[in-house]
């Protein structure tokens, strides 16, 4: 599925051009305590790969090698702490990329990949600090090939977005499942609410009901607002005790296989 999506994207690239899609990095709550990784949506859509600090480069230049991924290196010690890493070999074998390299090699190898191309597509402004890296890679590629015209950097958001706009059968069923999980969870939580409950208890019930049905994470921070809190559009304190006469507004939805649901 992911390889077919990549092939479709490559076929939509102009000849002699490339598309760069960076994955998400780990974000840290404090010290060495990180949040759960939520992979960048477009990166996951075309790769199926869910390790941090990865990078995908797709190329349309007539070569047999047109899908390249940079991934975290294999590291036995870090895998003891943080879990399995596919490494370059696993990225080729299990995710069907033509080539894969350790991500620390990207600064040297990406300019070589881009050398001689006419255009580089990249979604400008989506990942803080990464824009300059793409500019640096492109400048390095230009300096390696002074006899060719300079490479243009073009915003790739529309190119990627248009291919993702129309959902296939798998996506539609996945979206339906996400909505079903959330709808069933709403019903179960409504059965449990009583005066004296705290809003955070109700939030916890939603997270439990989502997870029990396969929605490991919420799609966004749930809003559980009793009484006047419901007048605050993005109320997320979720810490007040519910009175007997309170009405409760809940805005919550699970994420299932990277697809969100949203019910108020």
Which role fits each region the language model picked out?
Residues 161-164, 187-191, 228-229:
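A broad detector of the eukaryotic-type serine/threonine protein kinase catalytic domain
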Residues 31-37, 143-144, 154-159, 197-264:
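Short catalytic-site patches enriched in acidic/histidine residues
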Residues 15, 61, 113-115, 181-184, ...:
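Secondary-structure boundary elements
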Residues 10, 17, 26, 176, ...:
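Short, well-ordered alpha-helical packing segments
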Residues 167-214, 220:
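Active-site pocket-lining segments that scaffold enzyme catalytic pockets across diverse folds
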